[in-house]
Amino acid sequence: MKKKIIENVKTIIYALIIALIIRSFLFQPFYIPSSSMEPNLLIGDRLFVSKYSYGYSRHSLPFSPNLTNKRYLSKLPERGDVIVFKTPVDNRTDYIKRLIGLPGDTIQIIDGDLYLNNYKIQRNKVEITININCGSEILNVNAFEEKLPNGKTYIAVYNKEGTMINTDKFIVPK
């Protein structure tokens, strides 16, 4: 009986180690908690994110231990990629956003229009209206498809006055 318990404990420990390795170095599940990526990713969507696409850092490990500030086997993401990162403010909160700027790019929002490297990003209204939950209020806003200079596109959300409203600003280390 004691041998069987020891075998079961070993099996559980091996399973936990394998799960930790997969989650840390291969794929990690994420949950979409807000409407900031609608209509592409909806509230409640679940997805697996590749951990090896852009290399490894201390954030690849659970609890982001301060072992190193370097990134290993790194590759820069491309403009238009959906990325997951930890905000530098608390180093714990995961954000899922679309990348529109690369190192060296200049990004400006002038009168509600997006400029990338002094180039006004052209936008076409998408034939949908998005409902965004803002506390106790639900906003109906228009969605626009914006064409980036390298041919990739992303969806930006504007309010009724035409001002971009999904303008979260983060500086994310390479």
Regions found by a protein language model. Give the residues of each.
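Aromatic-capped interface at the extracytoplasmic side
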Residues: R23-M37
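Hydrophobic membrane-insertion alpha-helices, especially the h-region
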Residues: K10-F27
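Soluble "head" domains of membrane/secretory-pathway proteins
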Residues: K2-I6, I21, S36-K174
